[in-house]
């Protein structure tokens, strides 16, 4: 009984250290700055890797003032008139 308890405790310690090496801060992620001795965090900022997403792509593709508006007059509300001779939003 005591042998199995000791064996279980040893296995738990082994697993704890093995998992500890893979989870959390990896070596080299947090280093000491040479100039001032402060700790520096070298981990990648995952927030900066995200790309902004839009649900309404058609809103980004609208024509702005002074650009070609086509035959249908698809101008934004800031300059709603499509000139017939130039086909530009004014």
Curated annotation (Swiss-Prot):
Species of the source: Conus bayani (Bayan's cone)
Tissue expression: Expressed by the venom duct.
Protein name: Conotoxin ba9a
Residue positions assigned to the propeptide: 28-62
Entry's Gene Ontology cellular component terms: extracellular region
N-terminal signal peptide: 1-27
4-carboxyglutamate found at: 67
UniProt superkingdom: Eukaryota
Similarity field: Belongs to the conotoxin P superfamily.
Keywords: Gamma-carboxyglutamic acid, Hydroxylation, Secreted, Signal, Toxin
Domain writeup: The cysteine framework is IX (C-C-C-C-C-C-C-C-C).
Localization of this protein: Secreted
Main location: secreted
4-hydroxyproline modified-residue sites: 76, 80
GO molecular function: toxin activity
């Amino acid at each position: 009984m005591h042998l199995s308890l000791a064996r279980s405790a040893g296995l738990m310690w082994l697993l704890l250290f093995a998992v500890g090496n893979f989870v959390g801060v990896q070596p080299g992620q947090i280093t000491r700055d040479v100039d001032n001795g402060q700790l520096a965090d070298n981990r990648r900022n995952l927030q900066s890797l995200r790309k902004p997403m839009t649900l309404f792509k058609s809103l980004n593709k609208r024509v702005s003032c002074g650009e070609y508006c086509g035959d249908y007059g698809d101008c934004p509300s800031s300059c709603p008139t499509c000139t017939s001779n130039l086909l530009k939003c004014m």
